[in-house]
Amino acid sequence: MKFKYCAIFFSGFLGLSAILAACGARGKFDQVDDGKIKLAFSLTSKSASNALQAIVKKYNEVKKPGDYHIEITQIAGGYDGGRSDLQTRVNVKDTTNFYNLILNYPDLVSTLGRVGMELLFDKVNTDKLSDRFLDFNKRISAISKPGIYGIPVSLSTEVLSINGPVLHYILKSAKGDSDNVKVSQRTGETTQKSKVTNPLKINTQNDPATKDLWEKIEASAKANGKSNKDGQTKGKKKVEKSSSSSLVNLKQSTDQTTTDDGSQKSDNKIKESWGEYQEVDGGLKNFEFKASIFENWHDLLDFSTRVAKSFTNVKGKDIKKGTDIQGVLGVDSTPNSLFTSVFAAGGGDYNNFFYKIENGRADFSNFKNKGTSYQNLQKVFGDFKGLIDKNGIFVNKGGSYSSNFQKFHQLAYSISSTSGFFYSFAGNSAKRLKFGDNFIEFPRFTQEIKAPSTENGGQSNLLGTFEVKDSSKSKEVKKTNRKEDGAQNQGKKESDKKTIYLYKSQIPSDKTEGENAILIKEQNVINQLEQAAKKDEKGETVTNKVASLETKAANAKKDSSKTIIGYTTTDNVHEDGKNIFKINKLKTEDYDRKIIVGATEEVLEQSSTLQSDEAIVLPAPGKYQSGDAKKVTITQGPNIIGIHANEKENAETQKFVNWFLNNTESWEVKNGKDSSTKQQTAAEFFAESASYILPLKEIFDKDNKKATENKDNNTSNKKQANTYAEKALDLFQQISKGDIVSYSDPSDFRSGKFRDGIGSNFNAAVSSKADFDRFVKGFIATLGSEI
């Protein structure tokens, strides 16, 4: 009652910060001093996780005697899982199992601030960081006093990644000047084919930006369809793993004597899935293509809608299978797209946004009272609506990212995070697992499950086996005396693998759950593994359906124990209850293990996939309309956030964070199979390992020496150049100079609910083709009485 009375008395005169300070205890509690610092981590990125483990190991090695050691507390469920876990521990006042630090978004600071559990980093030197990237601390509600509560150690932004070969086919078809390009025109019940009569125009004469973009688009198509020095198409080297239909197509293409530069071959390949171009009103007839289309939301959505109208394979399918063209534009984060477009439409001013932080409180009145943000949302939604109605947009509804489809030419372009570069493109040998009309890209960190055989016991209880790396085994047997072991044994390599057994009813006494055995409980998985093994006995195993005759002949000579009946992975794939299921993981594993059954492995030609050098990477649209005065770029990524524990642990926590930001150490940096040692801070090591940007002042200086050095290293080393990180760095430099307005969500304990609500309701509107009134009504309903 004391707090309630106090809040009422002061609310008319003071901001929330003053109220909280004046009212004393607000649920704050001390954690038990257990002599260690716990860092909560919920990111799903393996590279980020591995980097953080290396950092913790390093700190515990170099810390002074008496300093607290640090350990990682793993939380499942990504950022949302971390948010939920922290809220629960705050609510129950967890004094024994709470943590001191968490990597997450700054709305968690507001959640902590409501009960006085936020930790001010007043003993951490943040002088190395650019001030503009610390400004978000001024937009956090419920904190008791101004200061640094969140430190951005892993920044990313969003880019517009164009599938060059696909856009080339679209534009070249609409231009009508490629070889044998014809257009479908529907007249009554018949479809007639004719030359393009109202061609699209590309002004390369008077528009340097458009000229440059078109040249890049042409180059990407040439790369996609070009021939190797020996005259083979670039997918030919992998043909022995391609499907029989691909073999036929490849033979036809190589039998033809062509002298084109590769772009025509690329167009022909894209046409197989995208279909014929159609001249329609409101499409690309007489349309002028400009590079500036991709700079603002209004023009981008208008152009995308025109493309969707021009291809039946896009507009004509309300329900799309996984193997269909998914749309023209892919959007990985619909909240990001809606927030940045509305923010840009409001002149890059938080006073015109959905909500703002003022006097320590979040003010949602602009949206609630149907002010500028509500009106701008209505305009933005209206631009999206045309694309939605023509089935031209793909949205991520929970783990199915645009890149999963764009890399297989199923989207023309997409907007996604710069942290996802290494997931965004196909490799030289692109593989995927097909389940009927759907598929997933062949996951990383995946093992094949082999059918049981007499060699591994032949028990009816045994479903199959797979192998994992055994770190306890030596990779090479040491050389021994010739007289004792013979020359033939010297330097002989020993397998560094161990076999894991999958059982269906019980694990035998000579095996141990989580060490060399896993018990499968899901009956659907058991049935599909057993069916696959039975098919193998008849020579009908599904995993070889797409193999060439050469591969099948080789497989026929193999023992049945080599037959693949499924797959298991620790990669971040989502279980669907049909083909992908969660199973128990091994004791040595940090990530959930999944099992994949009923799948057909398919290896694709490179011309059927998007390589990194065939993509054109642009900033995500920075304006709502071309005439807007300010350009906006989103800044996002997890921050280091401190949590109050007790006086000693608070001091030790700040000591670690200060070391993390400022102390230079030696780090092993892997580059493919090679590795080298690099001198840098833990923060720099973490950001580089996870494809993030650390906002250091020195990389934003006018002379930009460090940025140039980083870019040179990126393009000259053996790894593929990270064009997403390069674009992010360029945008962040412009933010630092004040040339671009940075957007990040104002941080309030209700921010997550607002973000999730607008995203889920927009995604539902994409599926149902709802109008604005229905969309916004559903959105407001999800917010409840809290907002």
From Swiss-Prot:
Residues 242-261 have a biased composition (Low complexity). A lipid is attached at C23 (S-diacylglycerol cysteine). A lipid is attached at C23 (N-palmitoyl cysteine). Residues 178-270, 473-495 are annotated as: Disordered. Residues 209-219 have a biased composition (Basic and acidic residues). Belongs to the MG185/MG260 family. This is Uncharacterized lipoprotein MPN_288. It comes from Mycoplasma pneumoniae (strain ATCC 29342 / M129 / Subtype 1) (Mycoplasmoides pneumoniae).
